């Protein structure tokens, strides 16, 4: 937008630009008329400023590092809302779709600033769950056309964030809000994903039952007693690790362990002691299987391929060590107390490069061996 104008020496002028959107030309015209005039524009701008001051000022920290203070006291919250929740865009993907896990994990950071937005996103995501328990990996509003996949962690973010929300807000009422399930065809054998518009099922359930269904859907384990990775976990690029239904994920084991622990408490609050006990028992078994199978001497493995080949052992030419398998051994409490310090020391030693200021996600990159974990190998 541009406006030509002339100014004399010492003269001041105020130019107001109005930018908005409507569903059609009539709505756009109506909105534009509401914001005519300098005072109306000034009031609208002041309202925006106050919104951001209240939102970003709700949580303040003070540390000896001014850079940390700046990024924490406002910038991260602003970025989460404007870019992640509203803009939904990035350098690699500028599609504007809602990602099931993406925006759920983002709203966790808003629990102390805009908890109502976290609640809203949780309920929105519950409405994108298929009746079988899996979910749309991503979808485009307003109609909801999106992709159904075999990715193994998406649906588990619903109980994870719900339990976290309830714990930090004490808003138990959200568990009783109902949402319909989605219905769509199941993935065919050998089919990794498909893009389609599902229909709203006539069947509905409370948020609590949506979460229970997600957890039950995730209790599928492989030969080592760890969760099946499917065609990717938190790392979508590992889409070939478990494409034939047998590959397992160590990171997902830690994540699921955390969910089982936290949702056991949520189930108790909801007076579902039977499912609370189920979560506790499954968590206990999972921790035993992690202890017996996932350790590789100095750090935790990352996964196993369908054929039983481990991903993340010291003997690998590629991805000898993966960051999130080490960090989540601590974050979840699922790692062996006598081993997690060694795991984190190994991560620091192998992944932190102070000279160039980066922390690698894994090391070495997938560029030496014939191992094909998926499209992560195509990133440059």
Locations of regions flagged by a protein language model:
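Acidic, mature catalytic/reactive cores of soluble proteins
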Residues: 1-380
């Amino acid at each position: 937008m541009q406006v030509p104008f002339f100014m004399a020496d010492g003269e001041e002028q105020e130019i107001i630009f109005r930018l908005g959107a409507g569903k059609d030309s009539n709505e756009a015209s109506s909105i534009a008329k509401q914001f005519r005039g300098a005072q109306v524009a000034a009031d609208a701008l002041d309202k925006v400023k106050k919104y951001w001051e209240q939102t970003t000022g709700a949580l303040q920290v003070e540390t000896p590092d001014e850079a940390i203070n700046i990024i924490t006291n406002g910038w991260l919250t602003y970025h989460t809302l404007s870019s992640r929740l509203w803009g939904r865009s990035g350098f690699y993907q500028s599609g504007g779709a809602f990602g099931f896990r993406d925006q759920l994990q983002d709203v966790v950071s808003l629990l102390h600033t805009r908890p109502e937005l976290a609640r809203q996103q949780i309920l929105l995501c519950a409405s994108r769950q298929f009746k079988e328990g899996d979910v749309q990996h991503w979808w485009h509003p307003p109609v909801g056309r999106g992709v159904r996949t075999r990715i193994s962690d998406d649906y588990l973010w619903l109980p994870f964030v719900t339990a976290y929300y309830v714990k930090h807000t004490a808003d138990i009422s959200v568990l009783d809000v109902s949402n319909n399930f989605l219905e769509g065809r199941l993935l065919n054998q050998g089919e990794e994903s498909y893009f389609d518009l599902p229909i709203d099922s006539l069947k509905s359930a409370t948020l609590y039952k949506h979460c229970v269904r997600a957890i039950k859907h995730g209790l599928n384990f492989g030969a080592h007693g760890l969760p099946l990775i499917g065609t990717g976990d938190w790392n979508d690029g590992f889409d070939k690790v478990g494409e034939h239904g047998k590959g397992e994920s160590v990171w997902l084991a830690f994540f699921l362990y955390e969910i089982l622990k936290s949702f056991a408490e949520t189930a108790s609050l909801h007076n579902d002691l039977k499912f609370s006990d189920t979560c506790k028992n499954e968590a206990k078994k999972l921790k035993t299987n992690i202890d017996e199978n996932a350790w590789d001497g100095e750090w935790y493995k990352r996964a196993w391929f369908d054929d039983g080949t481990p991903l993340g052992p010291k003997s690998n030419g590629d991805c000898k060590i993966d960051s999130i398998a080490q960090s989540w051994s601590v974050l979840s409490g699922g790692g062996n107390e006598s081993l997690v310090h060694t795991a984190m020391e190994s991560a620091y030693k192998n992944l932190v490069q102070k000279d160039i200021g980066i922390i690698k996600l894994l090391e070495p990159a997938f560029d030496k061996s014939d191992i094909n974990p998926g499209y992560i190998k195509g990133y440059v």
